[in-house]
Amino acid sequence: QDRYLYAWVRDKDGNEFAFFVPKDEEVEQRACTFVNESKYDVPSLVPHTSSTGGMLSDLIVNRFQYAITSGREMYRMINEKMRMSKSTIFNWLRHGAEFLENCQETIKQWLLKPGSTIYCDESWVDTKVTDANGEVHYKKRYMWVIVNLTTKVCYYLYGSRKKEVIKEFLGDFKGTLMTDAYAAYLYFNKLKDCTHVCCWSHVRRLFVSASRDYKDTLAQAFIDLIGILYKVEVENQVLGRTEKEIVKHRGEESLPVLHDLYQQATALLKQFETNKIKLSAKLQQALTYMTKHWEELMAYTKIGSVLIDNNCCERAVRPFTNLRKNFGGFSSEQGARVTATFLTFVETCKLMAMAPLDFFRGFFDMIVAGRRDYALMTEALLVKPV
């Protein structure tokens, strides 16, 4: 008590605390000077958080575009003289996603534009769930990814792998659907106004695996023929052919190759069934897969707006698999849905050739300003399809 001056202080928010000032007989004692806070701009915060729109946007982009983990984010903030817990980061992201969810209906309308082509794929993730008995454990869940290159939209949908998930989302979609041959998609073969097309890249992978992993020399002939199909597609893109020209060249150049593929496949399977030749298990799988879904694999030749494969969608899945690799899984289903929301807008911005950071900053600036007309906000920030 002889060495320090003691003071009890109450701040403007009502918080009370004590501080000690060392006594110095040689230093002139002066009264405290209080700062006039009205002279400074008070930062505008995103509702339900202590974050500005710019800071929240940085957190979103770092996590969902660059796959930076929470631990690395915390160390980054320490370097900037800031300290923040993981729970605070998660809560801010959750509140930010709650605002963005209101824009997803507009994105979905653009995605399912009648007459357009959508590409669909899915990938697994381990998610912590609580069952009916209250027991907590990890279960395998799926992230469905749907891409529309015409409207430049990407949509992430979290759920199980049951066909009801994608069936309910797509509804009675009128257009063309490109997928692999997973059984959940076969439902769309029954829809009158929906053309289901299967991906040739999946077929090629099976033959490549039979050749490389199983050393089956018979697979190489099919790989070479599929390569000719891709050569035609490269020429279509390089020469900038119209949809009518694409259909014409596919009919003239691709159809003969396709007929050759089918004849060779059925002939090999027939010889195998009569024990005349031996086939590796992987080549059997490839031949059966191709012949079983031949109608869907042939369908692309008649539609000039459809690509030969689903690779554009698989590229959109990759950011999610990077997250899965870095984070290991989701600690809650709510966290999985938050991820789906943010990835939808990150990948849509990339398809539209705009920076995701600019979109999020613009969006949260509107939120802070009090706007809640989400459809108009989405149209103002993104490129609305014609």
Task: Give residue ranges: language-model regions.
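Catalytic center-proximal scaffold of phosphoryl-transfer enzymes
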Residues: Q1-V386
